[in-house]
C-alpha cells in the first residue's frame, strides 16, 4: 500500500486533489489523504489540484507530505517534498504506524505519548482526565479529537485510552507554544486526527484488554469508517479470580468505545465530514462479600460527541466550518452518604478563514487567518462529597460520612473566542508568525487578551531554529472550581526556543528549552478557592527519531523543574507532577513477516508529602494525620524494559497480525508511594505492577 497526504504551504490538507500513479488516479479525502493498493514502488506520483501548481513525488511505503504551492505564487511548476513543520518548537507528530510500533504501549495509541519528552511518566496512569505535561496538572492541558475537546482520555481501569489506534490517522503533541486557534489551556495540547475510511478490507481485533471491529469503505464521492470496541476484562477476570477471594465485584471494569466517520467531497472545492465519538465506563464493587451497602462504590462515566464539519478551498482561500455537540454524564456513589451526579450537554461552533497572498508589501509567502469559536455548556450538578483535593494538598483521612461539599443546581458556561494570525517570510531564512487570541469567559466575567508569536530562522538547508512567546489562559472549570464564580482564569506566559536538525532523510534531531511563568493559580485559603498562587516551570528536552528501511528508532530525554507558591509570602514547593528526569530509548526492526522491538525507560519518581504523626478525632472516630512539608519527599526512580513482537501472515483471503507487548519484563517493582495504617503509625510501600503483558490478534478481510 502506497499512501500519503497532500497539503498546502501552511500544512493544511488539500481535499479533492487528483493523485496519479501510472494510469491509476485517486482523489484525496477531507484530510488530504490518499492510498494506492498494489502500486509499484519507485514510480512517479503526480498531484494536481485547482489553484495549485502540480506536485511530484516518488511512491514508497512511507511517502512524505506533498506540499503544493498556489499558482499565484509560482510562475512555473514547483515541487516541494518533505514533512510539514511541527506546529511549535518541541512539538511532535506521531503517525499511526509509529504509534503501533512503539514497544510498551500495548497497541494503545495514546499511551505511546508517554515516550514524548515533556509528558510526565508513571507506572500507573496519573489521571483519567488527561496528561500531565511539563510538570503541570492534567487539567492544565487539553485533549482534542479533530479540534474538539473530549472530557476524558483513559478508561476507568486506566490502562486503555478511549480512542482506538485503528481509527487514528495522526497524533499531534504540542507541549507548549501552541497556535492562537487553540485556547482554554495553560500548558499543552494533544490533538488526535481521526482517519477517513479507505479501500482496504474490514478489520477485527481481540486482545487481552478488549475486542473491536472496524468497517470501512468507499461511497460515491466519499468514504465511511465505523469502529466499535468493548472490554473483555469483565469476562475474563471472574474466571481468573479464586472463589475464596474476599472481594465482590458487582460489575468488573467494563467499557465501550464507538467511532463513526463519513466523508463526502461534492466537488474539488468542498469536503464535508460527519463524525461521532463515544465512550461508556462502569465500575461497581463492594469491599467484601458480606458487608452492606455502606461499603458500596459505583462509578459510571459516559459521553457522546457528534461533529459536522465542512472545508472549502479555492485558490488562495481556505475556510473551515464545524459544529459539534456533546452529551456527557458522570455518576459516582460511595456508601450511603456520598454521591455525585453531573450531566453536561454542550455545543461548540468553530469557523476559520485563511488566505495566502504570495508576495505582499515586500514580504514573501504571506498567510493570514481569522477565526472564532462559541462554546456553550450547561452542567447540572447534585453532589455531597468531601472537599476535593487541590494540587499539593495531601490526602484527607478516609471518612465515608464526610459530605462537607454539597450543591444542587445548574451552571451555564458560555465562552466566546476570536483569533487572528499573520505569517510572512522575511527573505529566504526568516519567517515570522504573529497573532492574538481573545477569550471571554462569561460565567466568571473574565476577558483575556493573549498575544502569541514565533520567529523561525533557517540556519542551514537542514537546520532550523525557532523561538516563540505567548500568553495562555485556563478558565476555572475543574471540579468544584465551577462553584466559585469569583475565580479568574489561571495565567501562563511561555517562552520556547530550540533547534531542529535533519542530517539526512529519515533522521530528525530536535532540542528545546522552555520557561513558563504561572500566575493567578487557583489554591485553597480556608474553605474558599482563590487566585493567589504563582508558579515557575523550566526545562530542556531532546528528541531523535529514525525511519530507515526496516529500522525504527526513538530516543528522548527531558529535564524539568516545576515549583509554585500557594499564598503570598509562602514558601516555594514542588508541583505534584514535578519530574526532573525522563529518558526513553526505543528501537524496532522488521525482518520478513516479523517485527521485534524494545524500549528502555528511566524516570524520576513523583513528589510525596510525608506523615509525621496523627491525632485521634473522637467525633469522627478516626485518626487525622499531621503532615510534614508539602512534597518534601520523592518516590524512587523507576526503570523498566519493554519488549514487543509482531508477526504477519496470510490466512486465506485475510491478512492476520499477532502482537505480544510486555511491559517491565525484568519485574522491577518500584515504589510509587506509601499506604498508611489506620492510626498512621506504620506505612507500607505501594508498588508498581511487576509485569504488564498484552497480546492481541488482528484480521483484515
Please tell me what each predicted stretch does.
Residues 209-230, 247-282, 298-320, 357-359, ...:
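Transmembrane beta-barrel wall of Gram-negative outer-membrane proteins
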Amino acid at each position: 500500500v502506497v499512501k500519503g497526504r497532500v497539503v498546502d504551504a501552511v500544512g493544511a490538507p488539500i481535499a479533492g486533489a487528483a493523485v496519479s500513479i501510472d494510469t491509476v488516479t485517486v482523489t484525496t479525502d477531507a484530510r488530504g489523504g490518499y492510498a494506492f493498493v498494489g502500486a509499484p514502488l519507485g514510480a512517479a506520483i503526480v498531484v494536481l489540484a485547482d489553484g495549485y501548481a502540480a506536485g511530484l513525488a516518488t511512491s514508497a511505503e512511507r511517502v512524505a507530505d506533498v506540499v503544493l504551492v498556489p499558482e499565484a505564487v509560482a510562475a512555473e511548476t514547483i515541487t516541494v517534498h518533505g514533512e510539514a513543520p511541527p506546529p511549535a518548537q518541541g512539538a511532535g507528530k506521531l503517525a499511526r504506524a509509529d504509534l503501533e510500533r512503539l514497544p510498551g504501549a500495548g497497541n494503545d495509541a495514546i499511551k505511546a505519548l508517554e515516550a514524548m519528552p515533556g509528558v510526565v511518566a508513571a507506572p500507573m496512569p496519573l489521571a483519567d482526565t488527561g496528561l500531565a505535561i511539563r510538570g503541570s496538572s492534567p487539567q492544565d492541558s487539553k485533549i482534542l479529537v479533530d479540534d474538539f475537546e473530549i472530557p476524558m482520555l483513559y478508561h476507568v481501569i486506566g490502562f486503555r485510552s478511549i480512542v482506538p489506534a485503528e481509527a487514528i490517522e495522526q497524533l499531534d503533541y504540542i507541549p507548549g507554544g501552541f497556535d492562537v486557534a487553540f485556547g482554554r489551556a495553560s500548558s499543552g495540547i494533544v490533538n488526535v486526527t481521526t482517519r477517513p475510511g479507505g479501500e482496504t478490507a474490514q478489520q477485527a481485533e481481540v486482545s487481552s484488554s478488549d475486542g473491536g471491529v472496524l468497517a470501512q469503505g468507499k461511497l460515491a464521492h466519499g468514504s465511511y469508517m465505523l469502529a466499535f470496541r468493548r472490554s473483555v476484562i469483565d469476562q475474563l477476570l471472574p474466571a481468573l479470580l479464586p472463589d475464596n477471594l474476599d472481594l465482590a465485584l458487582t460489575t468488573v471494569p467494563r467499557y465501550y468505545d464507538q467511532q463513526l466517520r463519513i466523508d463526502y467531497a461534492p466537488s474539488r472545492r468542498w469536503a464535508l465530514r460527519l463524525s461521532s465519538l463515544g465512550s461508556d465506563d462502569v465500575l461497581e464493587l463492594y469491599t467484601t462479600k458480606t458487608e452492606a451497602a455502606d461499603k458500596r462504590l459505583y462509578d459510571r462515566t459516559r459521553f457522546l460527541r457528534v461533529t459536522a464539519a465542512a472545508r472549502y478551498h479555492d485558490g488562495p482561500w481556505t475556510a473551515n466550518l464545524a459544529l459539534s455537540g456533546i452529551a456527557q454524564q458522570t455518576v459516582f456513589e460511595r456508601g450511603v452518604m456520598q454521591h455525585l451526579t453531573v450531566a453536561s450537554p454542550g455545543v461548540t461552533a468553530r469557523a476559520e478563514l485563511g488566505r495566502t497572498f504570495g508576495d505582499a508589501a515586500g514580504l514573501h509567502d504571506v498567510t493570514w487567518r481569522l477565526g472564532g469559536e462559541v462554546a456553550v455548556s450547561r452542567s447540572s450538578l447534585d453532589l455531597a462529597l468531601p472537599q476535593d483535593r487541590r494540587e499539593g494538598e495531601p490526602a484527607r483521612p478516609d471518612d465515608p460520612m464526610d459530605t462537607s461539599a454539597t450543591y444542587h443546581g445548574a451552571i451555564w458556561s458560555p465562552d466566546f473566542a476570536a483569533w487572528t494570525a499573520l505569517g510572512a517570510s522575511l527573505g529566504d531564512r526568516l519567517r515570522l508568525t504573529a497573532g492574538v487570541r481573545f477569550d471571554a469567559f462569561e460565567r466568571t466575567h473574565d476577558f483575556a487578551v493573549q498575544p502569541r508569536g514565533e520567529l523561525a530562522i533557517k540556519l542551514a538547508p537542514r537546520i532550523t531554529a525557532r523561538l516563540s512567546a505567548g500568553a495562555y489562559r485556563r478558565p476555572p472549570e475543574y471540579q468544584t472550581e465551577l462553584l466559585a464564580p469569583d475565580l479568574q482564569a489561571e495565567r501562563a506566559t511561555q517562552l520556547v526556543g530550540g533547534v531542529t536538525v535533519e542530517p539526512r532523510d529519515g533522521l530528525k534531531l530536535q532540542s528545546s528549552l522552555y520557561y513558563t511563568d504561572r500566575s493567578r493559580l487557583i489554591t485553597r485559603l480556608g474553605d474558599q478557592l482563590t487566585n493567589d498562587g504563582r508558579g515557575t516551570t523550566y526545562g530542556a528536552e531532546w528528541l531523535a527519531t529514525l525511519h530507515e528501511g526496516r529500522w525504527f528508532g526513538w530516543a528522548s530525554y527531558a529535564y524539568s523543574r516545576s515549583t509554585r507558591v500557594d499564598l503570598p509570602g509562602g514558601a516555594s514547593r514542588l508541583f505534584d507532577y514535578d519530574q526532573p528526569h525522563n529518558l526513553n530509548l526505543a528501537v524496532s526492526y522488521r525482518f520478513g513477516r516479523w517485527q521485534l522491538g524494545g524500549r528502555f525507560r528511566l524516570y524520576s519518581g513523583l513528589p510525596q508529602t510525608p506523615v509525621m504523626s496523627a491525632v485521634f478525632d473522637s467525633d469522627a472516630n478516626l485518626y487525622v494525620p499531621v503532615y510534614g512539608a508539602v512534597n518534601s519527599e520523592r518516590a524512587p526512580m523507576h526503570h523498566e524494559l519493554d519488549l514487543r513482537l509482531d508477526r504477519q501472515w496470510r490466512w486465506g483471503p485475510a491478512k492476520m497480525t499477532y502482537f505480544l507487548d510486555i511491559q517491565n519484563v525484568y519485574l522491577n517493582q518500584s515504589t510509587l508511594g506509601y499506604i498508611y495504617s489506620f492510626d498512621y503509625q506504620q506505612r507500607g510501600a505501594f508498588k508498581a505492577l511487576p509485569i504488564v503483558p498484552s497480546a492481541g490478534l488482528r484480521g483484515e478481510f
